[in-house]
Every structure is written in C-alpha cells, then in structure tokens.
C-alpha cells in the first residue's frame, strides 16, 4: 500500500484529499497534519472528511508522524510548503505540491530539493487542465503571431493569489510556444486610457466571486474568428484525484522535479 500523508488536512482541500486517498486502490491515508494550534488536533481524519473513523488522528507536528508515510501531499501556502519541503528533503520523503503563489526564487528551492527527493509540482492537478496545456501549445504554434491572446480566470472569494497559478502556467505555455518571455509580455488587468493593444502582449483578467471552483479560458482572437480553449472545474475532487494519481506514479521514481505532464505522459 502507498502510504500517503495530507498536510492542511482540516481545510477544504485537505478534506477532499483525504477522501480521494481513501477511494484510490492501493493507497491509504496514514498521516494527517494541520497547524499545531488547531483545535482539531487529535480528531480522527476520516471523521473530519465525513468518511467515518479511519484510525488516523490529526497531528500538529509533521516530525512526529515522519515514520508513518512515504509521500506527502501539500496544497497549503508557500511559506508552509517550503518548511515541509525542507523537512521532506532531509527525511527522504517524496512530495506532491499543489500550492500556488511561489516567487521565482521560491520555485528555485523546489528545483534544488528535486536533486535529493522525487517531487511532483503542478499549478493544477486536473487531468483536463493538463490536456488543455497540451492543446494550448499546439494552438499557439499554429495560430502564431496572427492573434491577440487573452487569459481569463475565475475562482471563489477565498482564493488569495491572482492571477491563479493555472492561468500563469497557461500563459507560460503559450509564451514559450511563441518564443516570448511571459514576464516581459504579460499585462495584468487594464484601466483608464490604455491605448491600442500591443499584439505581442498576453493579457490576464481575474474574477473572484462566490464559490467558483475554477474556470479558465484562453482566447486567441484574430480578425474574423476566435478560438477559445476553456476548462471549468465543478468540484475540488478533480484536483484531489489528480494529486493522488501523481502520488501513486511517483512510487519508485528517481529524485527530480516532475509535473503532471510527466505523470500523464504528455511531454
């Protein structure tokens, strides 16, 4: 059995991950971790996820459950994830990282850790989104410089980073296919007298409202026609199942920094 730990286990995504782990053949939740000051520490992780008792108590200290798992799934916050990364690197534990909002410098720390442990890091673990990334690469190469490119995304009111990591990843894929540097061509929102659109730019627009799980659209607009590639998530379970799939795939893999394109064989 693949022994899986979930950090941030008392949160919305954490509970969904617990459910996904317990549903996956060959996988089992053997550790669940949350903040040390959480009033839920000691509670049964299965009961937190409305699955019934599974005999795995919620811990407030990753080090105390280090012997209980093979791979850690982390969808938390950059500062938390980096602390967990340092621990897992030292302990020789594999990691699945779905946290977004890392700076370029912080991402480099993931690259360095990948020299010692196997890691799957992705802005989005949905199989559909990763298929969209493949389609976006093809669309950008075919349509080339003949189109204006805009990326729109919508998420629930609680999401703290913008644009979403998925939207940025989509932008990176498109920019790379066109030989552009996203940092130089990205335009984040528009206001006032912006002037005519620079055809080399890639625009981003963000919506935060209600309980939207995650909508992403990339628009390729030319004179006379438009191509839109859209993905809409209706449940967090799609991300959780992808993360568990990645955790199973990582079993026996050499140290390295992988992504969902590797997991799905899309490279």
From Swiss-Prot:
Keyword Transmembrane helix: no
Top-level class of the enzyme under EC nomenclature: oxidoreductase
Subcellular compartments: Cytoplasm
Catalytic activity line of the entry: (S)-2,3,4,5-tetrahydrodipicolinate + NAD(+) + H2O = (2S,4S)-4-hydroxy-2,3,4,5-tetrahydrodipicolinate + NADH + H(+); (S)-2,3,4,5-tetrahydrodipicolinate + NADP(+) + H2O = (2S,4S)-4-hydroxy-2,3,4,5-tetrahydrodipicolinate + NADPH + H(+)
Pathway where it operates: Amino-acid biosynthesis; L-lysine biosynthesis via DAP pathway; (S)-tetrahydrodipicolinate from L-aspartate: step 4/4
Keyword rRNA-binding: no
Gene Ontology process terms (BP): diaminopimelate biosynthetic process; lysine biosynthetic process via diaminopimelate
Coiled coil: none
Gene3D superfamilies documented for this protein: Dihydrodipicolinate Reductase, domain 2, NAD(P)-binding Rossmann-like Domain
Annotated residues for binding of (S)-2,3,4,5-tetrahydrodipicolinate: 156, 165-166
Main location group: cytoplasm
A GO molecular-function annotation: oxidoreductase activity, acting on CH or CH2 groups, NAD or NADP as acceptor
Enzyme active site: 155, 159
Alphabetized UniProt keyword annotations: Amino-acid biosynthesis, Cytoplasm, Diaminopimelate biosynthesis, Lysine biosynthesis, NAD, NADP, Oxidoreductase
Any one Gene Ontology cellular component term annotated for this protein: cytosol
Residues reported in the UniProt entry to bind NADP(+): 35
InterPro entries hit by this protein: DapB_C, DapB_N, DapB_N_CS, DHDPR_bac, NAD(P)-bd_dom_sf
Family: Belongs to the DapB family.
Task of the protein: Catalyzes the conversion of 4-hydroxy-tetrahydrodipicolinate (HTPA) to tetrahydrodipicolinate.
NCBIfam families in alphabetical order: dapB
Protein name in the entry: 4-hydroxy-tetrahydrodipicolinate reductase
Organism: Pseudomonas savastanoi pv. phaseolicola (strain 1448A / Race 6) (Pseudomonas syringae pv. phaseolicola (strain 1448A / Race 6))
């Amino acid at each position: 059995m693949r022994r899986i730990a979930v950090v941030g286990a008392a949160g919305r995504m954490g509970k969904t991950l617990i459910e996904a782990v317990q549903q996956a053949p060959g996988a089992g939740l053997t550790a669940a971790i949350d903040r040390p000051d959480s009033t839920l520490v000691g509670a049964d992780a299965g009961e937190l996820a409305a699955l019934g008792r599974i005999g795995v108590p919620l811990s407030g200290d990753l080090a105390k459950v280090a012997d209980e798992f093979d791979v850690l799934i982390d969808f938390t916050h950059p500062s938390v994830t980096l602390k967990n990364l340092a621990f897992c690197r030292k302990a020789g534990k594999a990691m699945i990282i779905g946290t977004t909002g890392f700076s370029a410098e912080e991402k480099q720390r993931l690259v360095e850790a990948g020299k010692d442990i196997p890691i799957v890091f992705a802005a989005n673990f949905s199989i559909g989104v990763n298929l969209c990334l493949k389609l976006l690469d093809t669309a950008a190469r075919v349509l080339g410089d003949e189109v204006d490119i805009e990326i729109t995304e919508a998420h629930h009111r609680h999401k703290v980073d913008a644009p979403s990591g998925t939207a940025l990843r989509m932008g990176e894929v498109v920019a790379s296919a066109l030989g552009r540097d996203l940092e130089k061509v990205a335009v984040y929102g528009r206001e006032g007298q912006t002037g005519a659109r620079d055809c080399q730019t890639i625009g981003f627009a963000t919506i935060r409202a209600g309980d939207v799980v995650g909508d992403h659209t990339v628009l390729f607009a030319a004179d006379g026609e438009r191509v839109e590639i859209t993905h809409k998530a209706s449940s967090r379970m799609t991300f959780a199942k992808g993360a568990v799939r990645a955790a199973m795939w990582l079993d026996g893999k050499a140290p390295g920094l992988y992504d969902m394109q590797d997991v799905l064989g899309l490279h």
